């Protein structure tokens, strides 16, 4: 699997928690701040944090834990 992305914003405590969960799950994702892109902000504004797989376009919305991340990546 390639292209794992975590969408969030700065000063988002849930996004910080999501990053910790990814670390716990051993997953590496590119962090993209949606506040820097109007289209992303419109699409994800109230849904963040969201984990997205670039290969499939599948998304995992918050809340998630390490087990859910592992299942998502399987």
What residue spans do the PLM features occupy?
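Short amphipathic alpha-helix with an adjacent loop that forms part of the alpha/beta core around
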Residues: 42-43, 70
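Small/polar loops that bind or transfer phosphate-bearing groups
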Residues: 7, 32, 61
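Local sequence-structure signature of Cys/Sec-based thiol-disulfide redox active-site neighborhoods
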Residues: 1-25
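Thiol-based oxidoreductase modules, predominantly thioredoxin-like and allied folds used
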Residues: 28-38, 45
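Structural micro-motif
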Residues: 45-51
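Non-catalytic, surface beta->alpha helical segment in thiol-disulfide oxidoreductase systems
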Residues: 55-74
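Short beta->alpha linker loops
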Residues: 10, 35-36, 64
């Amino acid at each position: 699997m390639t292209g794992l992305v975590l969408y969030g914003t700065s000063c988002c405590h849930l996004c910080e928690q999501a990053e910790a969960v990814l670390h716990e799950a051993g997953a590496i994702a590119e962090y993209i701040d949606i506040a820097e892109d109007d289209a992303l902000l419109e699409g994800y504004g109230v849904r963040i944090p969201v984990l997205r797989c670039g290969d499939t376009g599948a998304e995992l919305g918050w809340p998630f834990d390490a087990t859910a991340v592992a299942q998502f990546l399987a």
